[in-house]
Amino acid sequence: MKIKKVLVSQPKPATEKSPYFDLAEKYNLKLEFRPFIKVEGVTVKEFRQEKVNILDHTAIIFTSRTAIDHFFRICGELRVTVPDTMKYFCISEATAFYLQKYIVYRKRKIFYGDKKVDDMTKILLKHKTENFLVPLSDIHKENIPALLDQLHLKYTKAILYKTVASDLSDIQNLKEYDIIAFYTPSGIKSLFQNFPDYGWTYRLLQRNVLL
């Protein structure tokens, strides 16, 4: 079967230098981009049901900019003032610098690794007495909690945002696409949530195979 039209279940790249467009030109493909999932913040009511007191904690571990955004969002909605004594531990330098959007950047209270969870070990061990808060999505890896357990550190997980299906009702006919490229199980779940009764044959492409 000759592949002509591909639906990519992600947002359109911001730059024309993306490999997607190189592939499209090389193989004469028509690419359409449509995010199948989106991130929504939990409501104040949902957060309160978790029974997490932000101010009980002396340090926060951030794994992404999204986690930072939703932490300060929920603090604003709860009218919680984060004390200047709060310490921040970030997965990477880029994530740490993003904190400047919300706080004054002070090196003595902001720490970061080199994009890998294991890089955080030495840093965290220097702060054994802290009570850590870990903002997460409803769908998350357990690598950070597992590391904290391994190091016998005190922490609390807080679900501050969630991955939900996008509304795809404007897509009239999935059969017009020769391939639909997925990158997460959530994207596939969104497909069947939007088209529960749609009988068709599709090809799943993993990121390490194509696109």
Please tell me what each predicted stretch does.
Residues M1-L211:
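Conserved beta-alpha
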